[in-house]
Swiss-Prot record:
Any Pfam family matching the protein: AIRS
UniProt protein name: Phosphoribosylformylglycinamidine synthase subunit PurL
Record's subunit section: Monomer. Part of the FGAM synthase complex composed of 1 PurL, 1 PurQ and 2 PurS subunits.
GO cellular component terms, semicolon-separated: cytoplasm
Gene: purL
High-level lineage: Bacteria, Bacillati, Bacillota, Bacilli, Bacillales
């Protein structure tokens, strides 16, 4: 039930109740100054959620301005529900990634499920039909019973929601490191398709127009969810379980179809999802973006619980709700469309010209605040920054760690069993990735590929981030995150179009954490400019700490690419015996942050692998040209585990093998994680074309019809011999085996 008596404005100030809501003393004084009076309890709540990091990006906005956001094909950059990029033929791709980390740590099934629901609404509120979902997940070590529980429940929540709503979950990534034990990361991405003429904006335009509420009723779930997402997790966080929202994917499906029908009506003026901060953010942001105001009568808000206060209604984050603005006098048209889908559209207010959010309840004005103060004019901070001692120590090391390998085969099999490298089939077999029947490349390759019906085109999509590199060197790691995502798009035959990012970090009030955020956004910005991939939207999730210990800096990159002709679609699997195997790029003795270092030492240290963005760009462009020329049978990014793992992954499940000759020190050639490298196979008859197009390609060997990996050195000495079955057993069995463990 709600509070019996809300504190008075004076009590809010004197008892410093605003601190419990997340406002600092200085911020409360600023609210008082803006209003020219003390805010009441409800108004304090409005400011506390809108000025939370989750809604305002107050600690990160200064850094986000560094990102390139413009491009020839960008139709909508940051600022709306999702970004939009033109793909020709009057069509565009809409995509966005968001986090649901804190809710997933407390209530993993619903936290993950509602993360999927929220990102779907961001995309279809733009007028786009969602065509795919992806995710990026981080957990602690699977040897921990708590981690196994979180992992299983998060995957079940993603599957449960996505499968029911009828949108395929086609790809993503899952990584495991001890730093995520108490604070898993659950980032969900949605990709949608739209015709230019259907693009919508979340704006409340037209004085006198009607504000309507569509979708599920409002309950008490998720109250202060945005504030909860803007603080560190602790032992007490378990008590905040009621702050986690509960999703209904069947309601979402009805809402999706209703909204896509609504956008065909010229009676619709604006539409926005009620996401973080619920009615507060949707109303304040829609009015602020349009330079207008909104007056709402909360008596008309559909409520599923008795006795809800204005504070509770405005801060609820109940799921499957939309706020829309409709031309005055045409409300019935909207109601009829929505009713066709079994939903209600309720008139809750109107657009005004005074730039205020005015709330009425039981005949009284319960809040009257400037919309710009809530939205655009939230305070912005540039926190102090300090280089961490660990970074200085790593950088000053005179020599870098180089492993000594006693048995190459055992090392490869052990790497294939590492959960970060091992097959994620246990995860994606729970997802319906074929619903809508447009999925061309399923989970498990470098990028997922979804065709665009009625055209020869397809979209490649991926999520990527190696947070170990970012921990060792945030700036270099930021560059690598962008480059690896682009590499995966290119390996699928696509040209990278743009980026949506999810910046997952610790507490920015700690100078060392803010330094990580600052440096990694520097690296990301530079890579985006060099590779021509504008950032069209994203999300910031800070305070990812448990009892004062932060996660690694984890800026997850969501990237979409355009494949002009489905004939160019390429996968990582070797295709047929006789094809020639090439590696593009050279291996260097770079093991800092590598899977091998983690396997051997149990921890990471040293320097991240170096990256030259000009070389990266050249190799990507040349490989894409070779793919389009029909000279490439398979392509795979060389990433975690190095060349040896890439070779193994290229023959998993295929009735082929490989004979390879390496020239150089075995450990470096096979296991170093040097950047800007690709493993490709080339039809023998296309060898001349391939070699004329790709400069840095080194011929390693060829694909065989014997399912075995044979590696020799240039002197003919046997380096490794492993059957595909042995590798497959290690790779596929690792995660299911750990989940069955009772340790």
């Amino acid at each position: 039930m709600s509070l019996h008596r809300e504190p008075t404005a004076t009590e809010v100030k004197e008892q410093k109740i605003y601190r419990e809501m997340g406002l600092t003393d200085e911020e409360f004084a600023l609210v008082e100054s803006i209003l020219g009076r003390l805010p009441n309890y409800t108004e304090t709540g409005l400011f506390s959620v809108m000025w939370s990091e989750h809604c305002s990006y107050k600690n990160s906005k200064v850094l986000l301005k560094k990102f390139p956001i413009d491009g020839d094909k960008v139709l909508q950059g940051p600022g709306e529900g999702a970004g939009i990029i033109d793909i020709g033929d009057e069509q565009a791709v809409v995509f966005k990634i968001e986090s649901h980390n804190h809710p997933s740590a407390i209530e993993p099934y619903q936290g993950a499920a509602t993360g999927v629901g929220g990102i779907l609404r961001d995309v279809f509120s733009m007028g786009a039909r969602p065509i795919s979902l992806l995710n990026s997940l981080r957990f602690g070590e699977l040897t921990s019973p708590k981690v196994r529980y979180l992992f299983e429940e998060v995957v079940a929540g993603i599957a449960g929601y996505g499968n029911c709503v009828g949108v395929p979950t086609v790809g993503g990534e899952v990584q495991f490191d001890p730093c995520y034990e108490g604070n898993p990361l659950v980032n969900a991405m949605c990709v949608g398709l739209i015709d230019h003429k259907d693009i919508q904006k979340g704006q409340a335009k037209g004085v006198g127009n009607t504000v309507m509420y569509v979708g599920a009723s409002t309950g008490r779930d998720g109250i202060h969810g945005a504030t909860f997402a803007s603080e560190e997790l602790s032992e007490a966080s378990e008590e905040k379980r009621p702050a986690v929202q509960v999703g209904d994917p069947f309601m979402e499906k009805l809402l999706l179809e209703a909204c896509l029908e609504l956008i065909k009506s010229d009676a619709l003026v604006g539409i926005q999802d009620m996401g973080a901060a619920g009615l507060t953010s949707s109303s304040a942001e829609m009015a602020s973006k349009a330079g207008s105001g909104i007056e709402m009568n909360l008596d008309h808000v559909p409520q599923r619980e008795k006795g809800m206060t204005p504070y509770e209604m405005m801060l609820s984050e109940s799921q499957e709700r939309m706020l829309i603005v409709v031309k005055k006098g045409r409300e019935q048209e909207i109601k009829d469309i929505v009713a066709h889908w079994g939903l209600h559209a309720v008139e809750v207010g109107q657009v005004t010209d005074d730039k205020k959010l005015r709330l009425l309840h039981k005949g009284e004005v319960v809040a009257d605040v400037p919309v710009d103060a809530l939205a655009e004019d939230a305070p912005v901070y540039h926190k102090p920054s300090k280089v961490p001692a660990y970074y200085e120590a790593f950088q000053s090391e005179k020599t870098q760690w180089i492993p000594t390998i006693a048995n190459v085969k055992d090392t490869l099999l052990s790497l294939l069993q590492q959960p970060t490298i091992a097959s994620k089939e246990w995860v994606y077999e729970q997802y319906d990735y074929m619903v809508q029947t447009n999925t061309v490349v399923s989970p498990g390759s470098d990028a997922a590929v979804v065709r665009i019906r009625g055209t020869k085109k397809a979209l490649a999509m991926t999520t990527d981030c190696n947070s170990r590199y970012l921990f060792l060197d945030p700036e270099v790691g930021g560059k690598i995150a962008i480059a690896e995502a682009a590499r995966n798009i290119v390996c699928s035959g696509g040209v990278p179009l743009g980026v949506t990012d999810c910046l997952n970090y610790g507490n920015p009030e700690k100078p060392e954490i803010f330094w990580q955020l600052e440096k990694s956004t520097d690296g990301m910005s530079e890579a985006c400019r060099e590779l021509g991939t504008p950032v069209i939207g994203g999300n910031v999730s800070l305070y990812n700490e448990t009892n004062g210990v932060a996660v690694y800096p984890t800026p997850v990159i969501g990237m979409v690419g355009l494949i002009e002709d489905v004939g160019h679609i390429t996968t990582q699997a070797f295709k047929k015996a006789g094809d020639l195997i090439y590696v593009i790029g050279e291996a260097k003795a770079e093991f800092g942050g590598s899977e091998l270092q983690k396997l051997v030492n149990g921890e990471i240290s040293g320097k991240a692998p170096a990256i030259d963005l000009a070389v990266e760009k050249k190799r990507q462009e040349q490989l894409l040209e070779a793919i389009r020329a029909g000279a490439v049978a398979s392509a795979h990014d060389i990433a975690e585990g190095g060349l040896a793992v890439a070779l193994a992954e290229s023959m998993m499940g295929e009735a082929v093998g490989a004979d390879v000759v390496i020239d150089g020190e075995w450990t470096t050639e096979l296991f170093a994680e040097s950047q800007s490298r690709f493993l490709v196979s080339v039809p023998k008859e296309k060898q001349a074309i391939f070699e004329s197009l790709v400069e840095d390609a080194i011929h390693l060997g060829q694909v065989t019809d014997h399912p075995q990996l044979n590696i020799q050195d240039v002197n003919g000495a046997q380096v490794l011999q492993a059957s595909v079955n042995e590798m497959l057993e290690a790779w596929k069995g690792a995660i299911p085996c750990l989940l069955k463990s009772k340790a």
